[in-house]
Structures are given as structure tokens and as C-alpha cells.
Amino acid sequence: MSSIEQLYSTTQFPSLSSCNTNINNTNNNNNINNINNNTNINTGNLLKNTFFKNNIIYNTNNNSINNNSNNNIINNNNNNLLNSNNQNSFQNQNNLNSIHNHNNNNNNNNSNNNNTSNSENLDSLKSALLSSNIFNGSSSSIAHQNLINLIISSQNNNNNNGNSNSNTPDQKSTMADILLNSSVPDYFEWCSDIINMPKDGNEKSNNSNGGNNNGNNNGNNNNNHNNNNNNNSNNNNNNNSDSVPSPQNNYQSPQSDNQSSMVPSFNFSNQNSANSSNNNNNNNGSSNNNNNVRSEPTTPNDESNNNSNNTNNNNNNNNNNNNNQQQQLSSNQNSSPLIYSVPSYYVPNYGVVLSAPMKGNSSSSILPPQAWPQNNNNNNGNSNSNNGNNNASGFSDFMFNGSNIDYNSIMNNNNNNNNNNNNNNNNNNNNNNNSNNNNNNSNNNNGNNGGMFNGGFVNNNNHNNNNNNNNNNGNLNFHNFLQFQNQLQNSNQQQQQQQLQQQQQLQQHQQQQQQLQQQQLQQQFNIGKPCNINQKKGRGANNNNNNMPIGNQASLVISHPSLKMEGHHHLQQQQQQQHHHQHQQHQQNGNGNNTQIVNSAFLDLSSPDSHNQMSPSSPICLPESPMGAQHWESGLDPSSLQKQNEINPPISVRSNVVFFEPYLAGEPGRHKACWNLLEPMHRNYYQPIQFKLPSFPDTSLPITQIDDKTGIFDSQRFLAFNNPQAMSKYESYRIYIHPSLGYSGNAKRFKQQPDVNEKALILDGNVYDGHLNPIYNCKICTEYYQTKSYFSANPHAKGKVLLVKNNILTRVKDGGFTLSLKPMCCSGHNSHIPLYFHFTLTNPLTNEVVLQSLINVNVKQWKKSVPNKSKKQRFE
């Protein structure tokens, strides 16, 4: 934050309404507290009661001052105040202007005080300077030379019609000797020395004899020394010949917490044009303008253009009214207190938003700092870089000024107040092209005369022909601004593109992780499945033909665990289209021939969301599986059971207990026994089934002889095979249900998948009709469940022919376990032949099918309810 921003953010200004006496607040950090507003201010009292704390002036003098005091250094009879027009003398000043004493044109021959000689004034000043440490530091020699040049230049301007008491050359040399034997001033001691100058009762004012130069020399007042100006020397008592030299600008005053310092600048109430300028003959070209004096026009917005630079080259400087803010004062000159007007808005980063009427393009906004010109002023002599304190006088005048502000004056006042050597990093927009190569005061104003844009809303054509510094930087600044906008837009576009790329990469990474997780899950349920879709189609087309050797099928199953799943996504899309086409043919032909829709057996029923888009009245069209392959019963093809039944038909065993037998990898689908349940099952009803595991999983069932009468195999051998005392290999293993069969009902929180290295078995299976053709769905049952609004909580269960309850913890205990099965279709819908349920058990640790079982059961459509006794009595 710059100094002006810190000042505006921390300084609170009183809000008043009118002002009798102007205060030209041109310091970088303007902060005035309790300035005395008496009409006739005693200079001695003002300085005595003014103390400096952290470069902030505090005036504690609240007493009335005698209008006709003989001891006043300056006796202002007509509301004349001490015009301290050097706001920069306390912090990084360029023009080392000390206290400026301007004269009132109406004070002609109004002083009755006794006059003292210039020599007495010099003696008093000499004694004060010699008794104080005015200079101190390594840069004192430069400071000495600057002050000497200032004194010489100021004393060369005593051209006021013979009415001024100018110093003689001896007096000049005396002042030079005094200054060369001094050091850099300390403000407390320096001010106290000036205040405590020896005073006699005989000190009197040097009155002029009354001239006719009313306003003629108003533009020629020296900012450094007011030497008998305007024939009205009544205001410059004891200071007409040799005004007090100002402190050098290479002294940097201590900074306060608010980093603000200011010397109040007072104006005469009856003065029309008091715009003084430096008349240093050492300036190459136009000298620095007095940016600290306010003119008080008789009409509003009167631009006082009398601020000409009276040097050797006084060209093209007619509009140098920088910081010469016009203000129409109240007619009451003796009673109203000081008025401060605060700007309506303040933008910390970009400057002050002006609320007053502006000339030019008033709709233009202040540009950001990146678009401001970068003018590094190379200063000659004793200039100090005053970074951050650029808006000293312009904005301070604006803050203490009223309405009707000339925008050209304000915009050109920002950096022309004795801060002309500042290396402005942020606010270098409003410097003049009057690059005054003043080797002594280092006022190199290499700025932009046209404000922010040359020819824009500020048109102040102050060119110095002698210096040839017509730096029309407006177009360059506008080009820099456009370049800044383009860079900003390009950076924003690049950031947006990077964000999009990052989002895309993140989405791809998430998709890959999801696919990997689903792949790991799918591998647990794809044991023994062939991965070649063309092979599935070939076997599906030969459902009713047993021409394909079983050995070939076995080789396909054996090689499955080592196959990769690459390319399945593309093949699955083709297979899904064929399945949809074949499903339409199945609807047209009816349910009589189920072998025509073999490819629909590759539907993936493992995903819980696989049936969300399924319509009961339309064929089942399931979404793609994550692995790109359709699920079928683990370890089997849809035609495996039918082929093996024709080659090696199993032995039918009637029992209420179902035994698992070893899975033959070389002959998938081959069973030694088919377990016929003694009790029928009913559609849409749960029925518990008890399963047994062999004690020796690698040994086939000992079913070789069947009793013709009972139809039961040799029980003795079977009892020996199923020894209850022998511990099963899979004892205490947990049984998980494959998602293609599992149904949880209203239960939502239960474990569906085994953990890593967990001892578990996964149950998978499918339903076949009486001819061992797979059943995919039943149109009649589907429409029935739709009318009953079934599976509203579990839409993924719609269309399934068999459901197994999976929300109950099930483990192998004593060589067996029990599951609850619910058939969703009946035998009457499938040629009135009992249905076949086929199950497999897969070990997730080895990812291999280990056991299998085949069940034959009669499923009835309706279950007759038994009426209770009350109903029977009612019917009777």
C-alpha cells in the first residue's frame, strides 16, 4: 500500500461547510490537526505553538492574535496567514521551499511598525543559525550548495519597482558562510531556533512605499523567498530581504505510524492570483511551478494562468496552474473556521474517484496500476526517490477543496508539487512534460502531459520547447494498457484451459479406478466363463446339435482364467445388438422355442442397476457390464448341461437334501447325480433348501447302483462318503450370493462381497427348463409382477427367474448350510415339466469353481391356502 493509500485509509478529516482562509495542503501524507484559524496570525505564536510529531503538525494555539502586534514577525492586517507553501519540506521534497510569505495587495502603507534594517535581520538570523545544528549528515555539502543557490536565485528576483529591501552581495556571502558552516536541519531544533530569534522592542516591519503593482508580480513570487513582493511588504516583516532557508530535500523526516507529514499552506483572502513560481536562474528551461499556492478567484472555476515561469526560457507554460485549485471564498473573512471537504469515494488500489464535475471524458475510469506509465525520473543533484508519495498535492487539494473542481487541474496536480523527482511506480500518470533540468533542485518532470491518454480526458499541452521534452506518452500508455488487457485475457484463457485439462484428467483417473474396482469384483464371479464371444455364439447356435466335442468345450473353460479381458468392450456392443435383434424374434415366435435366443444368455445380471431401464412389457435389455462381458453362470455355457445330459445323463436321486459334487474342469456341466426334491416349490415363495458339502471335495459321489424299487442308490456307500465325523475342507467358510441371484428385500446394509484373503465361497447359478434350456425371463410372470407393483424397492430384481436371500449371514457348519430360494416362474409356463436349478461354488482366493450341484424341482404357480376353522364354520 502506498503512502497516499495509507493516509487516506487512516486519516479522518472533519466535515465542514465553508472556508475563509485557504489551506494548501500539498504534503504527501496530508494530516492537519487543530490548525489555528485566527484572522491575523502571529507568525511567532504560530511556530511556537506548532510542534512536530512524526511529521504531523499540531497547532495548539487557540488564542486570538492581536491584529496590530508590533512583535509579530508577520503582521497581516487583512486576513493574511503564514503561507507555508512547502509541503514537501518535511518528507522527500524536490523543491526545498521553506515558509513562503505572500503579500496582500490591499496592505499598502498600512503598517505603523518601526522598520529594522536588513543587517539586523541578518544578524538575528545568523545568530539563530549559528546557535543551532541546522545541518547534519554526509550529504551536507550538497545541501549547502543547494541552499546557497536558492538564496542567490531568490535574491535575484527583487524587481518590485524599487520597493523591496534586497540584500547586498555582502549579505549574500554572509548567508553563504552561515550555511556552509551548518549541517542538515533537525526540525525540532530548527523550528525552535527560528522561533526564538532575538527580538527587540525596536523590531519593526519594513513597509513598502505603496506601489501600483497589484497582481503584476503575482506570478513571479519566489517559492523559496518572498523578497518584497507586490509593494506590500507589510506582510513580510523581518523576512523581506532574506527569508528563512528551507531544509534540504535530502533530509528524510522520521515517519509516523500513519506515514503522514504536512505543512499547512495558507492563502490570502483578497488575492486573485497568488500563483508564484520558482525564479531560479539555474534552471535549464522552465523552472518548477509553485504547486502549493491556491488562487482565490472572484468567479468560480477561474483558472489563474499567471503562474508563468520567469526564467530565461519562459515558453509554452501558460497553463501551469498545477495545484492552483480555484475556490470561491465566503465573504466573511474573519469568523468562519477552516473547512475540510472529504472526497465521496476512495479506491485504495486505483486512486480517488472524483465526485465533482469533470472536463473531458467523465465516464472514463482510472486505470489499474499495470497500465500506468513507468517514468523513472533521473534526478540531478540532491533529489531523493519518494516512492509511494506521489499524490501529495493534487489529491490533498481535492480533499480540502469544495465543488466546481477543474478536472484538468486536478489530474495535472498529482505529481507536480515538489515531488517531481519521484520514481513513481504506481501513479506516474499526471506529470508534466515541463522537464525542468534543474541541477540544484532536481525537478525532472519526465511525465505525461496528456494525463492518462494523450488527447483523452486530460488535455494540458504544457510543452517545453527549450528542453525538447515533448514526450507524448499518452499513446504509449494506451498501447501499454491494451497490451496489459491482452496479457490478462491470455492468462485467463490459459488458466481455464489448464483447469479443464485437470478436470478431464481427474475424470479419467476416476473412471479408471472405477473400472479397476469393478474388474476386480467381476473377476470373482467370472470363473470358468468363456471370454470369446464368437465361441459363445457357435455353441449357442448348436444348442440342439451335439456335434461339438465336449473336449473342445472343456479346453475353452480351462483356458479362461488366464485369458485377458482386452477388447471385450467393443465385442460386447456387437453382441448386445445381436441379442436385441434375437429377442425381438423370440417375442414374435412365442415362448415355444427358447433355443433361438441363446445369445441373450450372456446378459449381465450382476450389477444392481442392471434392471433400472427394464420394462416388464418389453424384452429385457440390460446395460453393459463394467468388464465388457455378459454374465452367465460361473463355469458353464448355456448349452453345457444339455450336451452333457445327452452324453452322460446324471442319476436322479430323490432327496430333501442337496449334495454338492466336485466340478470337473475337463467336462463342465457333467453331473453324477440330479437331486429331485420330494416337496414341490411355489412361485414367489421362499423355501429353505439344505445343502451338503463332501468331506473329500476331490472324490466323486459314490452313486453307482440304484435300487429299482426305491430309486435310491446304495445308502451304505453314500453314508461312508458323507461321514459327519469327518471335517469338511470348507468348514466355517462364509457363503456369499452372486448379485445375479441375490435379493435382499428391504435390507440395505449387509455385506455382499468377500474381503481380501477371507475364507469364503460364492454361490452362483441359473434356471433351466425341462429340456435343460436356460430360462431368461417369463413374459407372463413379468406382467403379473408389474400389476402387483412388486420389486418397487428392488427394481434390479425384475425379470429374474430365481432369487436367493442374501441378507443373512451364512457359513458352512457341520459340512453344510441352508439357503432360502424363491422361484419367480413356474413349471406350468414351461411345457409343464419340472425346472432345473444349477448351482456352482467358487473359491475367490483361487478364482476357481470347486463344487457344483443340479436340482430338479416342480414349481407350482399358486400355493393353496389352508382355511382356518373360523372360515370353515362360516362356509358351512
Curated annotation (Swiss-Prot):
Induction: Up-regulated by P.aeruginosa, PAO1 strain and PA14 strain infection.
Disordered as annotated region, ranges: 76-120, 199-336, 360-395, 409-478, 530-552, 565-643
Stretches for region Interaction with the carA promoter element: 654-870
One Gene Ontology biological process: sporulation resulting in formation of a cellular spore
The UniProt record lists the keyword Membrane: no
Subcellular location field: Nucleus
Stretches assigned to coiled coil: 483-524
GO cellular component entries: nucleus
Bias (Polar residues) ranges: 242-264, 293-303, 589-599, 607-618
Alphabetic keyword roster: Coiled coil, Developmental protein, DNA-binding, Nucleus, Transcription, Transcription regulation, Zinc
Disruption phenotype: Failure to develop under standard conditions and failure to induce expression of carA-1 and carA-2 early in development. Failure to sporulate, even under conditions that bypass the dependence on early cAMP signaling pathways. Do not form mature spores and all cells of the mutant spore mass are dark in phase with round or irregular shape. These cells are fragile and easily disrupted under a glass cover slip.
Gene Ontology MF terms: DNA binding; sequence-specific DNA binding
Biased amino acid composition, Low complexity: 205-241, 265-292, 304-336, 375-391, 412-447, 455-478
Keyword Transcription (UniProt): yes
Main localization of the protein described in the UniProt heading: nucleus
Function: Nuclear transcription factor with zinc-dependent sequence binding specificity. Required for carA-1 and carA-2 expression in early development. Also required throughout later developmental stages - where it has a cell-autonomous role that is distinct from its capacity to control carA-1 and carA-2 expression. Required for terminal spore differentiation but not essential for cell differentiation and cell sorting. May function to help insulate distinct pathways from simultaneous and universal activation by cAMP.
Protein name: CAR1 transcription factor
Source organism per UniProt: Dictyostelium discoideum
